Amino acid sequence: MLLRKGTVYVLVIRADLVNAMVAHARRDHPDEACGVLAGPEGSDRPERHIPMTNAERSPTFYRLDSGEQLKVWRAMEDADEVPVVIYHSHTATEAYPSRTDVKLATEPDAHYVLVSTRDPHRHELRSYRIVDGAVTEEPVNVVEQY
């Protein structure tokens, strides 16, 4: 999907999935956490939380473990799912994609969610579309159920 000028995208996501991403980010802090929310192909609805391993084990960089990523992507394909959300945390900065994050963004249909855990008492969660190096922030609508 190509983003058209003037198109507004919104991430609609269940609260339990937000809580799962934040818990994963807190658990892995001070290292960056990363993972995927899978959903039925064509639905744009995240349904299943898949926490993944940060192969870098770093507070300033993340990289999905390539072997684990291959297994997860194959399992999603077998289940007719796609990566609706690809997320990771920033441990000392705001929830905004770095230049490296933008370079690593290879799924044009995914919502890229960043969770900042720099404040131990609250989190910051923001969502973006990243296509061909262009970063567009989108609203996040947290719901109890779809």
Swiss-Prot record:
It catalyses: [CysO sulfur-carrier protein]-Gly-NH-CH2-C(O)-S-L-Cys + H2O = [CysO sulfur-carrier protein]-C-terminal Gly-Gly + L-cysteine + H(+). Pathway: Amino-acid biosynthesis; L-cysteine biosynthesis. Residues 11-134 form the MPN domain. One of its GO terms (cellular component) is cytosol. Pfam families: Prok-JAB. Belongs to the peptidase M67A family. Disruption phenotype: Strains lacking this gene are shown to be attenuated in macrophages. Keywords: Amino-acid biosynthesis, Cysteine biosynthesis, Hydrolase, Metal-binding, Metalloprotease, Protease, Zinc. Inhibited by EDTA in vitro. A motif (JAMM motif) lies at residues 88-101. GO terms for molecular function: metalloexopeptidase activity; zinc ion binding. InterPro entries: JAB_dom_prok (IPR028090), JAMM/MPN+_dom (IPR000555), MPN (IPR037518), VirAsm_ModProt (IPR051929). Zn(2+) binds at H88, H90, D101. Its EC number is 3.13.1.6. The gene is mec. The keyword Zinc applies. Protease that hydrolyzes the covalent CysO-cysteine adduct synthesized by CysM to release L-cysteine and regenerate CysO. This is CysO-cysteine peptidase. GO terms for biological process: cysteine biosynthetic process; proteolysis. Its cofactor is Zn(2+). It is an enzyme of class 3 (hydrolase).
